[in-house]
């Protein structure tokens, strides 16, 4: 999360990757009859961007969306891996080329790159609450935040199931979004009037319970969890609201024992 004024441009966001060897266990064979399709042994590669702040055009130190799209296309073309493409927030507000359309032009660019999911960052509210809601309509993939509420109801979808191979059971990914409660002070207060940001750890654990209860009722068992956390890392950020604290808390969640979780 960054300040409420136009976002800094000191560090370009580039796609980062993580593989099963470090982050996520390979999918286990489903306990189904022998004739059911089984997942192949593949690495999982997560390409993630965050805090791009409207950097659509390539310049020194900035990859730009054209080259970003090429990287995504090249990774998805690799048949020996499963590729997820996600964004951890603050994608739209920042540079004039994006601000001129209130970020809507860049939202459409992300659609062209076919992202799998995105978390809500504090700067997604910089053009007002109505515009933040509008992003949900423009984007063709889920915009996630499990801890953003209006009138006691979640404003955004809390989680999504990403299934890269619908013919294979057991290789789905549960993606959960969470937004920094600092949003209340890191965008203009008028932009989040009536919006409540609840505790990240409590809310993510609640979503895990919700997802697993629904999965059990449907006879499913999701083994991979990815948390897109737009949380602060500064010393001024309360410890309970930091991404590192969330990662530590999830590692102790008994519901996730024997599973793998990646916090981005």
What residues fall within each predicted segment?
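Acidic, metal/ion-coordinating pockets
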Residues: 34-264
């Amino acid at each position: 999360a960054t300040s409420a004024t136009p976002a800094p441009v000191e560090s370009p966001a580039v796609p980062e990757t993580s593989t099963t060897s470090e982050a996520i266990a390979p999918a286990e064979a489903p306990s189904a009859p022998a004739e059911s399709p089984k997942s192949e042994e593949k690495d999982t590669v997560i390409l993630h961007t965050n805090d791009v702040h409207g950097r659509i055009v390539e310049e020194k130190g900035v990859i730009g969306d054209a080259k970003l799209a090429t990287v995504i296309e090249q990774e998805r073309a690799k048949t020996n891996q499963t590729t997820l493409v996600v964004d951890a927030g603050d994608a739209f507000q920042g540079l004039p080329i994006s601000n001129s359309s209130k970020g809507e032009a860049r939202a459409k660019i992300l659609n062209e790159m076919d992202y799998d999911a995105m978390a809500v960052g504090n700067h997604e509210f910089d053009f007002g609450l109505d515009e933040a809601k509008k992003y949900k309509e423009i984007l063709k993939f889920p915009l996630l935040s499990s801890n953003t509420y209006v009138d006691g109801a979640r404003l955004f979808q809390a989680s999504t199931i990403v299934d890269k191979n619908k013919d294979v059971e057991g290789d789905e990914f549960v993606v959960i979004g969470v937004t920094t409660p600092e949003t209340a002070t890191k965008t203009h207060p008028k932009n989040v009037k009536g919006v409540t940001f609840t505790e990240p750890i409590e809310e993510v654990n609640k979503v895990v319970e919700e997802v697993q209860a629904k999965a059990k009722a449907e006879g499913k068992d999701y083994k991979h969890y990815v948390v897109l956390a737009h949380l602060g890392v500064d010393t001024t950020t309360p410890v309970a609201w930091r991404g590192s604290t969330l990662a530590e808390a999830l590692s102790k969640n008994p519901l996730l024992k024997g599973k793998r979780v990646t916090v981005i």
